[in-house]
């Protein structure tokens, strides 16, 4: 899989996490809707699914992991920023195959 496919998966995962935070809909419904709307030809679908599901399951742990590095209370972080932080923290904590850059 090309690195670009992972970048697209990561971007779609951030959209999915944001949608989940706003709507409170089941993560499976959000995943299904995003995959229906997206051209998956150049997307690493498995990576997208792992991130999206992983963030939904592990968000309390991820939130606690990033809190010490914030300059304001976690509750004051914008939902877009929270989605990015959660996806990033998930990759750093659980996706050991992602190289550090």
Q: Where in the sequence are the language-model features?
A:
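N-terminal interaction/assembly modules
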Residues: 1-101
